[in-house]
Amino acid sequence: LEQLTTDSSGQTENISLPAPPEEYSLEPGIYQPYSEYNVLVEAEGFQPLNISGTEVLAGAQAIQPAKLTGDEDSTPSEDPIVIPDHTLFGNYPPKIAEAEVKPVGESGEIVLSRVVVPQTVVVHEGTPTDSTAKDYYVPYRDYIKNVASSEIYSTWPQSTITANVLAIMSFTLNRVYTEWYRNQGYDFTITSSTAFDHKWIYGRNIFESISQVVDEIFDSFLSRPGVRQPILTQYCDGRKVQCPRWMTQWGSCSLGQQGYSPIEILRYYYGDSMYINTAEQIAGIPASWPGYDLTVGSSGDKVRQLQ
């Protein structure tokens, strides 16, 4: 359809591509609301990259990242990258319900002293017990943009996008703060399974309207009075899956269309005690103090986490 050349910063010009009517993405229905395109990226000195399933929505700017692997690199690139169905259109396992606040036991299951925004999230591409699944080190903001682009449509009202991004970030920061998976003996922050966490898709495209919201509020999370940890804000689509006392994605779209603000949408589902809080930023992957200093010659899980 198109052949483009990147500029000095590695970006192409914007192009327009056909997509289904925008209204398909504003109400649940049987028609796929986005077009799918295949992208081939080639550059001298690099291995070619094929991406299958880039999603394009009507009236929305899609951004397709493409990280190339050098010819001299002995590690083959993932080729092709296949982007599966969007969670609102495809079939995925429903979220297994959890308590929105994790217990703080005397044994110290929760030991991070403050809520922090990690520089990097370690994403396990599968269920927690799937030892064959890969772990990916993903910058926090890139992770949130990917998840939001996989979980909601970028054509939705900005207040709806903001409410959903806040829920995604608070859920993620709860996993960081509680060291949920590390305390179970795993070396990752979160999974890509919708049954346990939310959907992250390796190599997928994101959307400009979602990216802008994340950049504006990436250090925010959701709180309740007297609770230190970010709230584990669970949600579902509200059409294929029902989830009382959780936010429904299609319902949040409707509320945004009615003029509800982000916090009004969130309180509609999670209650009036919910409020927006701000976290500290931090470099690296947060991990609690192991009970002893790490020095030259130290070994074990805590050293591996820091590495």
Indicate residue ranges for each PLM-predicted region:
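Charged, low-complexity interaction regions that mediate assembly/partner binding
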Residues: 1-2, 80
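Short, acidic Ser/Thr/Gly-rich low-complexity loop/linker segments typical of extracellular
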Residues: 2-26
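Surface-exposed coil/turn segments at beta-strand junctions on protein surfaces, enriched
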Residues: 5-7, 30-34, 57-59
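Short, conserved glycine- and acidic-residue-centered signature motifs
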Residues: 10, 32, 248
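Conserved, single-site charged/polar hotspot
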Residues: 17, 40-53, 58-307
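A short, solvent-exposed beta-strand micro-motif common in secreted/extracellular proteins
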Residues: 22-45
